[in-house]
C-alpha cells in the first residue's frame, strides 16, 4: 500500500484474473506485455503457483511501471483513490467489488457466467470494455493494451467513470435500510424462518 500511496489519483491499473483462471506461459506473456505496453502504472496479481510462468524479460519490463505481487487485499486496493481501472476475469465477486468501489473495468472473461457479466459491464452498465480474443481464443497483448488505454485515456473514459460511480451509488442505496437488497433479505427471512 505504500507504493500505491505515492501514485496519482486514478492513475493505477489493478490486474487480477481470479483464483481459478489458469493462463499458460504464452498467454501470461501476452497479458503482461499488454499491461506494460499501456504505459500505465499497475499492480498485477500473479498467484505464487503461476509466477514461474513469467519470463525474466517480462519481469524486468514490468519493474519499470508496476508491481507484480502474489496477493493483495483486493477490496482495499480497489477502494484506493489511485486505482483508475480494474483488469479482471469478471467473476461475480470481483465485479461487485469494482461496482461498490466505482472502478471502471476491462473484462477478460473465461467461462461460466463471466462472459455474460463482461457483456453487462460493457453494454448494459457502460462501465468498461471487454478484451476481444483472437479467432483461436488467444489473448493478444495489443488488444489488452488497447482496452486499458480506452478505459484510462480514451474518448469515453469520463463516461466509464461516471457510469461506475452511478452503479456504485445504486449499490449503496440497495444495501441501505429500506433499499431493495435490504427488503429482499427481510422478505426471504420472513418466508423461510418458519421452516
Q: What is each of the regions a protein language model found here?
A:
Residues 1-195:
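Catalytic core of nucleotide-sugar-dependent glycosyltransferases
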Amino acid at each position: 500500500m505504500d507504493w500505491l500511496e505515492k501514485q496519482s489519483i486514478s492513475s493505477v491499473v489493478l490486474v487480477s484474473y481470479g483464483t481459478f483462471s489458469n493462463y499458460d506461459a504464452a498467454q501470461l506473456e501476452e497479458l503482461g506485455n499488454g499491461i506494460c505496453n499501456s504505459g500505465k502504472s499497475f499492480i498485477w496479481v500473479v498467484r505464487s503457483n503461476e509466477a514461474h510462468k513469467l519470463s525474466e524479460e517480462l519481469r524486468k519490463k514490468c519493474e519499470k511501471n508496476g508491481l507484480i505481487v502474489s496477493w493483495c487485499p483486493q477490496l482495499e486496493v480497489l477502494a484506493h483513490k489511485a486505482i483508475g481501472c480494474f483488469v479482471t476475469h469478471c467473476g461475480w465477486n470481483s465485479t461487485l467489488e469494482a461496482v461498490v468501489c466505482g472502478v471502471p473495468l476491462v473484462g477478460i472473461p473465461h467461462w461460466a457466467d463471466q462472459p455474460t457479466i463482461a457483456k453487462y459491464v460493457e453494454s448494459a452498465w457502460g462501465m468498461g470494455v471487454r478484451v476481444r480474443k483472437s479467432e483461436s481464443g488467444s489473448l493478444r497483448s495489443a488488444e489488452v493494451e488497447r482496452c486499458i488505454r480506452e478505459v484510462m485515456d480514451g474518448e469515453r473514459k469520463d463516461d466509464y467513470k461516471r457510469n461506475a460511480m452511478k452503479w456504485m451509488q445504486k449499490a449503496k442505496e440497495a444495501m441501505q435500510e429500506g433499499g431493495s437488497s435490504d427488503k429482499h433479505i427481510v422478505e426471504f427471512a420472513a418466508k423461510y424462518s418458519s421452516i
